[in-house]
Amino acid sequence: MNTTLDHLVVIAPSLEAGVAWCERTLGVTPGPGGQHPLMGTHNRLLRIDGPGFERAYLEIIAIEPGTTPLRQPPLRRWFDMDDAKLMQQVHADGPQLLHWVARTDALDSALACCAAHGWDRGPALQASRMTPSGLLQWRISVRGDGQRLLNGVLPTLIEWGDVHPADAMPASGLRLRRMRLQHPDATALQTWADAVGLKGVEWHVGPAALQATLSTPKGEVLLGSPE
């Protein structure tokens, strides 16, 4: 089983606010993204791949105004985006790195590894959308309650089809240099990471937090989640 960081998830109060944050913080304008009718969200994307982080990208995601998710209550949006406290924080403080997604070539086995550690990562949903570069198809783990788990430190898991979105993204001038993950149960997380073949990220004991270091046109930038 091979697993690696796929993308970082920055949740924004609106997509316009997310674009402005990206330009102000990282010095670049994000590329186009898409809509997620099932979740009632939309995004903008940009490539951040670097040594050890092949095909990695940054996702800026927000609830799409005027839409109703096809995923009806009691099912909730992914990434805790129906969590009132979390979204209140995002609206008060602006876009934030709150989660990440890891891609794997054996999603069902990786989910079983989560379950073995007592983490219900949720079922695998099948999804697809057409893009100029071809049909994107993927399977992604989403809990019915939409929770990220472990304050976002445990990644959502994804398995892509033949086409990966980063292959069609132009170079952005950004490079992911380091991904640091902190949690009181870091030892168990490291054991899980070893079991699913996840390399390239660092696990540290401490309050739950994510930290990504990127090289940008503005110099080195540290993106971090609130502890």
Language model features with spans:
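Glyoxalase I/VOC metalloenzyme domain signal
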Residues: 1-5, 11-29, 41, 48-227
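Conserved catalytic-core motifs of GNAT/GCN5-like acyltransferases
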Residues: 29-37
